[in-house]
Amino acid sequence: QNVQLLPGKSYTITLKFELGVQLAANDINLTQNGCTASDKNNLAKLRWATGNLKSTGNTNYVWTTATDRGYYYTFYSTYTGNTNTNNTDPCSKLNTAYYGTGWRTPSRNTLAMLSRCTNKALINKGMWFMNSSIGLFLPAAGYRNDNRGGSGTEATTGPDTEGYYQSRDDAGGTVSYFMLLRNGTAEIQAYQKKDGKTVRCVKGD
């Protein structure tokens, strides 16, 4: 649509942009792990951060680039630098001036849907979900075992070969749900809340 701007007039142009990855259902073509039509339709409603969380403290969080590992967070907690948890969604701390609002740590069910829509192939130290060119790339960032410090900035176990992505759902007792990825595997498991795992934020979940 062409708009004619007249001399002597004042105009305001408002630009709206959405950060993140969101695919239409018919673009979700990685179905080798049991991805269903329902999974595709539900995933199409979500927008994903393009990188893992990479911030310390408790305010103005950012996410990193798509291939960077980011930092490691205990279950449903902002960055603590140790094995403590604080019952705070770290995705809620993303800088709203830049990213907007509504970001959350994914639910167990959302990560389960995502885990089904992949070819389970580890490539370039990570795994593609939904689509291998325009989909979601999750680095195999490893994790931080709780006896090696929990939350922190560097992996202690499995970097480049495994990924451990936090959900926001408690599995009871000392464990919580997360998504595990390694070559040939993408699935939901439950493990220690005190471990440091990566976080990929989502909107619409």
Give a label for each model feature.
Residues 4-6, 42, 154-155, 190:
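Generic structural signal for short, flexible, solvent-exposed coil/loop and linker residues
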Residues 41, 47:
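Extracytoplasmic/periplasm-facing segments of secreted or lipoprotein envelope proteins
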Residues 78:
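Extended carbohydrate-recognition surfaces in non-catalytic/accessory domains of CAZymes
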Residues 50-60, 65-75, 83-89, 93-104, ...:
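C-terminal, surface-exposed recognition/capping segments
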Residues 1-38:
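Extracytoplasmic cysteine-anchoring/structural motifs
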